[in-house]
Design a protein with these regions (language model features):
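Divalent-metal (often Zn2+) His-rich catalytic cores of metallo-beta-lactamase-fold enzymes
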Residues: 25-37, 41, 296, 306, ...
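Conserved beta-strand hairpin/beta-sheet module of binuclear metal-dependent hydrolase folds
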Residues: 102-162, 287-291, 295-301
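Feature captures hydrophobic
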Residues: 22, 460, 466-472, 479, ...
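Gram-negative bacterial Sec-dependent N-terminal signal peptides
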Residues: 1-23
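Metallo-beta-lactamase
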Residues: 111, 135-136, 143-145, 197, 203-279, 323-332, ...
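Active-site metal-binding motif and surrounding structural segment of the metallo-beta-lactamase
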Residues: 134-135, 145-195
Length: 652
């Protein structure tokens, strides 16, 4: 996932107050959409109920209703909103998506095998609990502390109350570590009572991924997860690999032990583990875990009951499909003949050696097919969009439920392969330096005979069910004149039908969020922070200085020259120089003629440059921490932009 880069948790932070109006404005499926969705029932093996058996197998207990609140009474997690997910799919939801959404409703404590349990449906991700000789080993403590604590409490209500002795992060996405302080304290880790284990590169990946482009990712995450949509057959029904993400307190405790070599082993509280490193697959830092005494392979998030993202719609660096299939192939080679259970940190397990190999090889072959076929077509001269339109999985892969596109899609994953190897440019000079969207839109509309003419033709296309084209052509009218209510309404209607037909819930959410904002405008919400106190504490000085450079308003900085020294208590030193409208820094160096010198740790420096004005004023008053010209420091910080949280997407 999902994954803080997006902080998945940020997509739903108290911003659903407008859901009622969204539900009231939503329209029903057209006859064309209803027919398209009905046809899906004939295309896929709906008689295969194995996933339903597996998803409910080993169920012990759950909380009813599953509503989790924080200390102030605010809701952190609530599955009761999804009570509508019963019976057959309505016309407004693709039946394949409806099936997956029902499967993801399985929630509670599940016994996987003796000594191995999972809590599912308490967040987007799963918490895996291993019973050691004296205590518990927690794998991936969910997104927020509130749900992580509730998940552990559920376990304790049904199993012996033993202390947590270790926490393992399988990878660097927020839904796999953010709730850590709900199961252990920082003091327990610092004292050595609890080990925190992670793959090499975890901290750098977990922090950096959410900082430099964090604001843009957070805004786009609202679209990917359908944050403003009501949970209903007309709105958000699922997130593909879970229902949605929890709201609450996001935390991070740094690892005390790191896996640096493939097949490295640990014995934790009597439990032997072997780790398969998988960097650059689903996350920059990731690992799979072989548990020989349980004959169980934890595949982290590299094999789930869906095609995963090679590119995530909220935005991120594209992932390496070649590395991904090779990782799964190595898993089959290493453990396929020994594994009797496969678990993942999303969704439900697979039991039985034959089924496991079939599941893993199906996932492996899917990623390799998308990789190879996309490049095959690119080498024949097809552009990115043409590649995405042309790549189709063979039925031997496409008819496996675990290979359906509930998170990634063949279309946008094929584009990711193209992007990774070739990039954005089609090589057609017409695409080299096109007019920007608004200017081009005005020209398009003028060439097409004006907005009224375009709208008249778009209405005819809508009536024929040509929703993709209607959405595409009306973008020009909306960008040429965002006040054109008729264009906005018709484009919203087209988005809506596309959403209703989408098998992929993230596509559905994207379309329905676009329709929502065309009809309602952009909600007036405060900027969404992508950093918590724990995240800021984990930032390296270099990352913090890089982020300053990203925030620099180059117009304000034009012609300015400022030189600062930064000295940390541990002896680290940096120079910071503003010149030519860029911030350049160097480690292990000091200016002899600096305008000012700051003597403070990274957290204090972060408060100075990222905190509110009142906090800055308080820090600047401390003569013991800053010497020299404080005006220069103020001038530099005043040049740093505070990014708008809710920038335009479907309008210019």
């Amino acid at each position: 996932m999902m994954k803080i880069k997006k902080l998945a948790l940020l997509c739903v932070m108290g911003i659903c107050s407008q859901n009622l109006s969204a539900a009231e404005m939503a329209k029903n499926a057209t006859d064309i959409t209803a027919s398209a969705n009905q046809s899906v029932l004939k295309q896929l093996p709906f008689n295969d109920k194995q996933d339903f058996d597996d998803a409910s197998r080993g169920f012990i207990a759950t909380q009813t209703p599953l509503t989790i609140r924080d200390a102030q009474g605010n809701i952190s997690w609530d599955l009761s909103d999804y009570g509508f997910l019963k019976g057959a799919a309505p016309a407004t939801v693709n039946p394949s998506l409806w099936r997956n959404a029902q499967l993801n409703m399985n929630n509670g404590l599940f016994k996987v095998t003796d000594g191995l349990y999972q809590v599912r449906g308490y967040d987007l991700s799963n918490m895996t609990i291993i019973e050691g000789k004296t205590g518990l080993i927690i794998i991936d403590p969910l997104v927020t502390t509130e749900v992580a604590k509730a998940a552990l409490d559920l376990y304790y209500q049904n199993r012996p109350h033993r202390p947590v002795v270790a926490v393992i992060y399988t990878h660097s996405h927020a839904d796999h570590y953010g709730g850590v302080k709900g199961v252990v304290t920082e003091q327990q880790v610092a004292s050595g009572q609890v080990t925190v284990l992670a793959p090499t590169g975890f901290m750098d990946a977990a922090v950096s991924e959410n900082v430099l482009a964090g604001n843009a990712m957070s805004r786009r995450t609202l679209y990917q997860y359908g944050a403003m949509l009501p949970k209903s057959p007309l709105g958000q029904v699922d997130a593909g690999i879970g229902k949605t993400t929890s709201e609450g307190t996001f935390t991070l405790i740094a690892p005390t032990d790191t896996i640096t070599r493939d097949k490295e082993q640990r014995v934790i509280d009597g439990v032997t583990m072997e780790f398969q490193l998988a960097p650059g697959t689903e996350a920059p830092a990731e690992m799979l875990i072989w548990l020989p005494q349980f004959k169980t392979l934890d595949v982290a998030e590299d094999a789930i009951h869906s095609l995963h993202n090679l590119y995530t719609l909220r935005g991120a660096e594209v992932r390496d499909a070649s590395n991904w299939w090779k990782t799964l192939n190595q898993s089959i080679e290493n453990y396929g003949s020994r594994a009797e259970i496969v678990i993942a940190q999303h969704q439900w397990p697979v039991w039985g050696q034959t089924r496991i190999v079939d599941f893993l090889s199906g996932q492996r072959d899917m990623y390799k097919f998308i990789h190879d076929r996309s490049l095959n077509l690119a080498n024949k001269g097809l552009t990115m969009d043409e590649v995405a339109e042309s790549v189709k999985l063979p039925d031997s892969l496409a008819l496996k439920w675990a290979n359906r596109g509930y998170y990634g899609s063949v279309s946008h994953d094929a584009k990711a392969v193209y992007q990774r190897y070739i990039g954005w440019y089609s090589s057609n000079p017409a695409d080299l330096n096109p007019l920007p969207p608004v200017e081009a839109a005005k020209q398009y509309v003028d060439y097409m005979g004006g907005a009224d003419n375009v709208l008249a033709k778009a209405r005819l296309s809508f009536a024929k069910g040509e929703y993709r084209w209607v959405a595409q052509v009306l973008k020009q009218v909306v960008f040429a004149d965002p006040q054109n209510k008729d264009a906005r309404e018709l484009q919203a209607d087209a988005f809506e039908q596309l959403g209703y037909q989408s098998e992929n819930p993230t596509w559905r959410n994207e379309y329905l969020m676009g329709a929502y904002e065309l009809r309602n405008g952009i909600p007036d919400l405060p900027p969404i922070s992508t950093t918590s106190r724990d995240m800021i504490k984990a930032m390296t000085p270099e990352l913090l200085l890089d982020y300053m450079g990203v925030r620099l308003n180059t117009d304000k900085a034009n012609g300015q020259h400022i030189r600062l020294n930064w000295q940390q208590p541990g002896g680290q030193q940096y120079t910071i120089e503003l010149n030519n409208s860029v911030i350049i820094y160097e480690a292990n160096k000091q200016f002899s003629d600096a305008d000012a010198t700051l003597k403070m740790d990274t957290l204090s420096f972060a408060k100075l440059v990222m905190g509110p004005t009142t906090m800055r004023a308080s820090i600047l008053k401390e003569s013991s921490t800053i010497t020299g010209d404080k005006v220069k420091i103020n001038q530099l910080i005043d040049m740093l932009d505070n990014f708008p949280g809710m920038f335009n997407i479907v309008t210019p």
